[in-house]
Amino acid sequence: EMGRVGAAPYVRYYPLSVWDEMYQKKISEGYQDKTTLMDVRSSNTYKEIEDDSVRELISFLQQESSMAIKSNYSVSVSEVSPQMITQAEDILNQFTDNPRKDNSLLEQLFALLPRKMKNVADYLLPADAEPEQIQNVIDRETDLLRMMETQMQALPSNDSKEKTLLEEWNLSITPVNNEKELRQIKRHMGHSADCFSKAFRVKNSNRDNAFWNYYDKHNYHKEDIHYWYHGSRNMNCLSILHNGLILNPKAPKVGHMFGYGIYLAPKAKKSIGYTSLNGSFWVHGTSDTAYLFVMKTVYKSPYHVYTWTSGMKSLTKSRISPHDAVFAHAGTSLRNDEVVIFDDAQVTLQYIIELKQQ
């Protein structure tokens, strides 16, 4: 059998004696052997999450992620294997600041994981693409790939009936009901508290362990811990809960303002602009419900930036040493303060806040 991944295969029967001949013929015609990349999934289910509000949260985020995958890919999650994800990541890691070469890589990516596209050219880069445009495409494809990978990792295994999805992921999510804690969260949000709906305390064991190991290793103190915001579209939130905010050491560094790092904001308003909330400034959200992350981060000697220069696009952990973060101040270059972290062990999840359009 042969055909596109995700489509019904074209089946013909031939004698085994002509296998090698037919195989070589199809390979020469441009077909690719995907046998080792395909996978078979089970139809088990997870144990139900007990808390109603947490169950509704995870269900909503799964639905948002699933809808994004269905609207972008012509293959389902069950038809994608870990090997295909790895191969797709390898393709993304090869991106440069050369639009022609990058378009060739995009075509390879679309062949590996077929997309729903009326016109492929609409998803490619213009010949004169600026670094920021290239970075936007890299971010677009990386987000979709992480969504797909997270949905795959959410597929139940044989022993799933004994665990909830959160237990499988070493993740704890509990609603914040303490009035003092709620007041503190809202006060920190400032005027943005007008769209506060509810908050959940998040404990990701893997990211927490990395954070506290880094904290101890570098002799940080309590006063070095800061709580800043990170906004993302609804479709990305499940992946962030599962993985945290992680950096890919092989990722191409093309068009980031202060280099490739984790970008956080001291003001909720700045990060809300990146969420799916209706009218959000940066991504033009259209949803009445959106989510904002509060990240716990640690640093004690930030590199302060008051005026941006083009050389700052190539900032890295080693280049800002002995500083351990970038604090870019609002002013001539930025509307709002921004914090950039270059080691993902310095950041872990604290809260996910539900926002409602008022």
What is each stretch, according to the model?
Residues R4-S28, A210-Q358:
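Segments that shape or occlude catalytic/ligand-binding pockets
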Residues E1-N236, E338-Q358:
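Intrinsically disordered, low-complexity terminal and linker regions
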